């Protein structure tokens, strides 16, 4: 039973994690991989049971009026569970970087100096909504030889508990300490306040959720923080570009799924191709119910090539109400900063690549931004000058994902520049220590 005293409870979690981290740091690669494969098998064997627990969370979320994108993030479908299992297996098949020595060089004194990759120790993960994060965090923690304390959102408590039980079962059956992965079993937010102020136990905190959560954690934490901020991702359609390819990619980047942080929220279009590109993508978005918040230039092109029947929705609608269909509205300044997580996209016509880069660097959350172009020099300029964790050429921002990057899983997508940036996989949960080898040398 959880103690009423949240300080005692958090300290108990921290002490157990610290003790387990010492065992995990020296765990053999084969043992860690066995635990990951065991976990993959347990996930597949328990799909029905997991969905029963998940259904309780979803029912409670719907009854409480949780927004539809947040409810969508809660769902543990068979496909989501299978992806988690595959992520565990992919991690098990990857090389173990723990103990790897890099950059070994002989110095004039005779000593050899290099760096060894080692686990961070204990990380705390504070996240909202997505229960699959429990598996992603746990599997990466196991592979990287760390211990972790996970605190999911109250809206996913039953799903997270069920998943954490499977993780601990896999650890125990593989000969590793169950305490290497601990889930906070209470929804009391006071525990979060304790976790982020325990440098004696916790080496780093990784918050993954809304802007309010991350700002509070960053402000109050007494341990280092790796931030997973919002994803105001941009796709820029350049001149020249393959229009058909650009329509296909811009469609996927926005409508493949609305709730992930790697969905495109703003579409920038070079003026020279706007008259050809915008009507085509407009018809696609209109058919899928995507609201388009446009700057005056884009709006004028759409009005000349009307892809939708505009309606008045109280957001500076451009015309009187006709019928409930996808809408064109005049974008406001705040729209350029917005992560919608919904069938809404901001659209702006720009002079060219220079203006696109300037716009992205001003309004982007520095998560993921893409250029669609046939100009190699423009592509290289975009890659150099856009200040984001992931920059892409001729592909969908939806690929900004640890699994798609071959990391096996991700703990989050860091928009920081310090320590880890972009999808945080195994190496992001390690640090480097110096290794010095000698043969009796002494300093003069």
UniProtKB/Swiss-Prot annotation:
Q: Which domain of life is it from?
A: Bacteria
Q: Which InterPro entries match?
A: Ald_DH/histidinol_DH, Ald_DH_C, Ald_DH_N, Aldehyde_DH_dom, G-glutamylP_reductase_CS, Glu-5-SA_DH, GPR_dom
Q: In which pathway does it act?
A: Amino-acid biosynthesis; L-proline biosynthesis; L-glutamate 5-semialdehyde from L-glutamate: step 2/2
Molecular function GO terms recorded: glutamate-5-semialdehyde dehydrogenase activity; NADP binding
Q: Gene Ontology cellular component?
A: cytoplasm
Tell me what reaction this enzyme catalyses: L-glutamate 5-semialdehyde + phosphate + NADP(+) = L-glutamyl 5-phosphate + NADPH + H(+)
Which leading EC class covers this enzyme?
oxidoreductase
Q: Which UniProt keywords apply?
A: Amino-acid biosynthesis, Cytoplasm, NADP, Oxidoreductase, Proline biosynthesis
State which Enzyme Commission number(s) the record gives. Answer: 1.2.1.41
Taken from the record, one Pfam family name reads Aldedh
Subcellular location(s) per record: Cytoplasm
Which GO biological process annotations does it have? L-proline biosynthetic process
**Its family?**
Belongs to the gamma-glutamyl phosphate reductase family.
The protein's job, in short, is: Catalyzes the NADPH-dependent reduction of L-glutamate 5-phosphate into L-glutamate 5-semialdehyde and phosphate. The product spontaneously undergoes cyclization to form 1-pyrroline-5-carboxylate.
Q: What is this protein called?
A: Gamma-glutamyl phosphate reductase
Q: What gene does the UniProt entry assign to this protein?
A: proA
């Amino acid at each position: 039973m959880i103690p009423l005293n949240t300080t005692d409870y958090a300290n108990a979690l921290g002490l157990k994690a610290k003790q387990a981290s010492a065992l995990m740091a020296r765990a053999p690669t084969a043992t860690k991989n066995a635990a990951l494969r065991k976990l993959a098998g347990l996930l597949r064997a328990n799909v029905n049971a997991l969905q029963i627990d998940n259904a309780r969370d979803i029912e409670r979320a719907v009854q409480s009026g949780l927004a539809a994108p947040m409810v969508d993030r809660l769902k543990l479908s068979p496909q989501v569970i299978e992806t988690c299992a595959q992520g565990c297996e992919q991690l098990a098949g990857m090389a173990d970087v723990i103990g790897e020595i890099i950059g070994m060089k002989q110095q004039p004194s005779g000593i050899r100096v290099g760096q060894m990759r080692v686990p961070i120790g204990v990380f705390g993960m504070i996240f909202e909504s997505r229960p699959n994060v429990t598996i992603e965090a746990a599997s990466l923690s196991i592979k990287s030889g760390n211990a972790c304390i996970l605190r999911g959102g109250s809206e996913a408590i039953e799903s997270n508990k069920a998943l954490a039980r499977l993780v601990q079962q896999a650890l125990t059956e593989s000969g590793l300490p169950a305490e290497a992965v601990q889930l906070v079993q209470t929804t009391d937010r006071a525990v979060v306040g304790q976790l982020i102020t325990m440098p004696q136990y916790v080496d780093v905190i990784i918050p993954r959720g809304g802007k309010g959560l991350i700002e509070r954690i960053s402000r109050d934490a007494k341990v280092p923080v790796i931030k997973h901020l919002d994803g105001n991702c941009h796709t820029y359609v350049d001149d020249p570009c393959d229009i058909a390819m650009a329509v296909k990619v811009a469609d996927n980047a926005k409508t493949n799924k609305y709730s992930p942080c790697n969905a495109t929220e703003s579409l920038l279009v070079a003026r020279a191709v706007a008259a050809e590109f915008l009507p085509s993508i407009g018809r696609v978005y209109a058919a899928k119910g995507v609201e388009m918040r446009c700057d005056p230039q884009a709006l004028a092109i759409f009005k000349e090539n009307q892809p939708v029947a505009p309606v008045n929705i109280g957001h500076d609608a451009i015309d009187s109400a006709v019928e409930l269909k996808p809408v064109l509205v005049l974008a406001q300044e705040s729209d350029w900063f917005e992560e919608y997580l919904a069938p809404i996209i901001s659209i702006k016509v720009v002079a060219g690549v220079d203006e696109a880069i300037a716009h992205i660097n001003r309004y982007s959350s520095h998560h993921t931004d893409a250029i669609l172009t046939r100009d190699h020099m423009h592509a290289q300029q975009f890659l150099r000058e856009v200040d984001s964790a992931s920059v892409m050429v001729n592909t969908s921002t939806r690929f900004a994902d640890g699994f798609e990057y071959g990391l096996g899983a991700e703990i989050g997508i860091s928009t920081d520049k310090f320590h880890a940036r972009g999808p945080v996989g195994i190496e992001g949960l390690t640090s480097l220590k110096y290794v010095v080898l000698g043969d009796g040398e002494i300093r003069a």
